[in-house]
Amino acid sequence: MAKAGNIERVVERADTELMPPSMYKVILNNDDYTPMDFVVEVLQLFFKMNEHQATEIMLQIHHQGKAVCGVFPFGIAETKVAQVNQFARQNQHPLLCSLEKA
């Protein structure tokens, strides 16, 4: 309500506690056709790994069938999955990137 040019303000304080966002693992899955050097390139390009890190993860994918490339909030994880899958298709590779709740 206004009183002689003064404005009365009501400020409500929320009694809710902020929760951290749910985190998701971004996973690369092995296949029999995608070249190893392409997987290393993907890891460097989309997950900012150096060559040594990318090679280690690529070998884990090759030997264990899949590997976690990073853990991110849902929106970032979803974007990385879409970017990797699109990049793989553009380069005619069946490489599959997926996500699961951490």
From Swiss-Prot:
Family matches, as SUPFAM superfamilies: ClpS-like
Pfam family, any one: ClpS
GO BP terms: protein catabolic process; proteolysis
Cross-referenced Gene3D superfamilies: 3.30.1390.10
Cited function: Involved in the modulation of the specificity of the ClpAP-mediated ATP-dependent protein degradation.
Subunit composition and interactions: Binds to the N-terminal domain of the chaperone ClpA.
Protein family membership: Belongs to the ClpS family.
Protein name: ATP-dependent Clp protease adapter protein ClpS
Species per Swiss-Prot/TrEMBL record: Shewanella amazonensis (strain ATCC BAA-1098 / SB2B)
Originating gene: clpS
